[in-house]
A protein has these predicted regions:
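Long amphipathic N-terminal alpha/beta scaffold segment
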Residues: 94-96
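Short, electropositive alpha-helical surface patch
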Residues: 63-76, 153
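Short acidic alpha-helix initiation/capping motifs at coil-to-helix transition points
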Residues: 27-38, 76-85, 143
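Conserved phosphoryl-transfer catalytic core
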Residues: 11, 18-69
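Flexible, glycine- and charge-enriched loops at secondary-structure boundaries
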Residues: 22, 26-30, 76, 114, ...
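Short, acidic loop-to-helix structural element flanking the phosphoryl-transfer center
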Residues: 73-84, 89, 98, 105, ...
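Short, flexible, glycine-rich and Lys/Arg-enriched loop motifs at helix boundaries
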Residues: 16-27, 141-149
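Asp-based, Mg2+/Mn2+-dependent phosphohydrolase catalytic module
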Residues: 1-6, 38-50, 122, 126, ...
Length: 249
């Protein structure tokens, strides 16, 4: 069957996290939160040390709580919304909506510096773009949409994609099949069976399979907490993104 669409996961599929470790990942968020707090101090939204301590403690608690909840419910909690909820709980209201988005930008800014395309990513996308009538998209479980957009633009990769979808924008996370079907719609495609999804984990393969897509697992060396076994028959395995070229007909 002719493949009409190819959906890529972002992290550890198109991009790698430099010298990846769980500790480094969380350190990026700790630095990002400090940067966000500096912004809140500059704008006089947080104006004393006691409220800053309360804010920091509550934000970390909420972020962890919502992340664990999202794994169970598949509902996404965008970072900007977490900032809003924390400030509201501290009775700090009437904050400009743009501030919440800026705080999320700052929170993810250190993480953003660590993501770089795999060495074969751009070359593979260029070759795939030469396939007649093949549409491509990025689909990421990420709580801040602009992080993915910024990185695709930074490395001149936006031009290859007909759609960029994140759980932050859609409201649900992979493996919920709805986010895959929504991505197909954004690509202008109607038949899941003519589309492939390539990702590095359970959410990509199981979700893609439930939505009726063909699936490709991109093997990842680093293991994360919350890993789940993939109980899906007949998915393709690749060790490098360039191997996808062997499976597009």
């Amino acid at each position: 069957m002719k493949i009409e669409g190819l959906i890529f996961d972002f992290g550890f599929t198109l991009f790698e996290f430099k010298n990846a470790s769980v500790e480094k990942y969380f350190e990026c968020f700790r630095k990002g939160l400090r940067k966000s707090i500096e912004k809140l101090k500059e704008t006089n939204i947080l104006n004393n040390e006691e409220i800053i301590k309360q804010f920091s403690k509550l934000f970390n608690k909420k972020r962890s709580q919502y992340f664990k909840q999202s794994l169970k419910t598949k509902k996404e909690f965008p970072t900007s919304n977490v900032f809003e909820l924390v400030l509201e709980e501290l009775n700090i209201e009437k904050v400009n909506r743009e501030i919440y988005l800026e705080l999320a930008d700052l929170y993810h800014s250190y993480e953003e510096k660590e993501w770089v395309p795999f060495k074969n990513t751009k070359d593979t996308l260029e070759k795939l773009s030469n396939f007649k009538n093949l549409k491509m998209a990025v689909l990421s479980n990420h709580p801040h949409h602009m992080t993915i957009i910024n990185l695709l633009k930074k490395y001149d990769l936006m031009e290859f994609f007909n759609a960029v979808v994140t759980s932050a924008k859609f409201g649900k996370r992979k493996p919920d099949p709805d986010i895959f079907l929504y991505t197909l719609k954004k690509m202008g495609l109607e038949k899941p069976e003519t589309c492939m999804v390539c990702g590095d984990e359970h959410a990509d393969i199981v979700g893609g399979d439930k939505a009726g897509l063909q699936t490709i697992l991109c093997n990842r060396m680093l293991k994360f907490p919350f890993e789940r076994e993939i109980n899906v028959p007949n998915y393709i395995k690749v060790n490098d993104i360039s191997e996808i070229l062997n499976h597009i007909h």
